[in-house]
């Protein structure tokens, strides 16, 4: 790894000059230690369950990285194309003036990340915030989405974005749900994971705790004893939790037995189900805060 020439690449931020090139490192190989978070670490290693203080995630894209920085998340490094450093990425670097920056030829960067580079391309390895407990995120919540066994990161990300846009207060995730900090999930949600409080549940997907806290619990499923999500009694519920199930098998039988009601979206043309992210968007819209 090589340092680029110093004394150049300065940008003006809030009336002060910030040197960029003094902290830019040129990578020559995927073996360079500085790019290990972007290439060598598996999702499980990024979670670092044994040492939570070392857990990281990857923010991708200028908007997502900026949102993370504005929310106070701690960047450990940046990885970006050379033209971004003094171009569109300059504002990002000025927001974190001492964080190391890594760059290199496009073929090296593509080998590191495993995908083709876009024009405005930037990644940042960031420290994960401390995890919250279900009790913490539910304390003042009135509308909660519960994700059970949803394994596709893009679906998790899409649901986070919908929940943020429609004003839902919190999200709970079962132990077998995809990690909300997965790079693809963070990208799809456009940083909503930074703004919507969330927590992992126990094996019961939190249904016991939600019931004890007075939530009206509703599971989405293809059952005859269901109601539409625009049901007036659901809209008027003071505290409501909507359970969304696995892409292939839906909610567990035990979860549905624990739910007070079952929701089913009416459909036409002999279509019986939607992608879980699409179904979530409809249900969360119909049951959004203040709709009753």
Residue ranges of model-derived segments:
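Structured adenosyl-cofactor binding patch, chiefly the S-adenosyl-L-methionine
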Residues: 121-123, 162-166, 180-192, 253-292
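Short, aromatic/basic amphipathic alpha-helical patches
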Residues: 87-98, 255
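Glycine- and other small-residue-rich loops at beta-strand/loop junctions that grip anionic moieties
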Residues: 27, 57, 148-149, 174-175, ...
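Amphipathic alpha-helical repeat scaffolds
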Residues: 61, 151-159, 274-279
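RNA substrate-binding interface of SAM-dependent RNA methyltransferases
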Residues: 20, 70, 101-103, 126-225, ...
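Active-site/ligand-binding-proximal alpha/beta "capping" segment
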Residues: 219-271
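A glycine-rich helix N-cap at a beta->alpha junction
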Residues: 97-114
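Boundary-proximal intrinsically disordered activation/regulatory segments immediately upstream
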Residues: 15-84, 178
């Amino acid at each position: 790894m090589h340092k680029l020439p110093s004394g150049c690449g300065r940008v003006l931020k809030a009336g002060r000059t910030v040197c960029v090139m003094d902290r830019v490192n040129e990578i020559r190989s995927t073996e360079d230690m500085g790019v290990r978070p972007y290439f060598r670490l598996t999702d499980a290693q990024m979670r670092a369950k044994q040492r939570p203080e070392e857990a990281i995630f990857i923010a991708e894209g200028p908007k997502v990285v900026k949102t993370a920085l504005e929310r106070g998340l701690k960047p450990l490094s940046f990885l970006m194309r050379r033209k971004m450093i003094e171009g569109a990425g300059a504002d990002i670097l000025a927001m974190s003036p001492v964080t190391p920056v890594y760059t290199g030829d496009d073929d090296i960067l593509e080998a590191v990340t495993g995908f083709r580079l876009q024009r405005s391309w930037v990644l940042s390895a960031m420290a994960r915030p401390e995890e919250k407990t279900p009790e913490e995120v539910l304390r003042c919540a009135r509308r909660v989405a519960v994700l059970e066994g949803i394994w596709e990161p893009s679906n998790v990300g899409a649901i986070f974005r919908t929940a943020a846009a429609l004003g839902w207060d919190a999200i709970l995730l079962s132990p077998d749900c995809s990690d909300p900090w997965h790079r693809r999930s963070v990208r799809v949600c456009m940083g909503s994971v930074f703004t919507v409080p969330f927590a992992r549940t126990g094996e019961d997907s939190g249904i016991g705790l939600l019931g004890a806290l007075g939530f009206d619990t509703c599971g989405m499923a293809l059952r005859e004893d269901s109601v539409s999500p625009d049901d007036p009694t659901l809209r008027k519920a003071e505290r409501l939790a909507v359970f969304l199930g696995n892409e292939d098998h839906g909610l567990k039988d035990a979860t549905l037995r624990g739910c007070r009601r079952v929701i089913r979206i009416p459909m036409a043309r002999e279509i019986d189900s939607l992608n879980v992210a699409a179904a979530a968007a409809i249900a969360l819209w119909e049951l959004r805060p203040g709709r009753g």
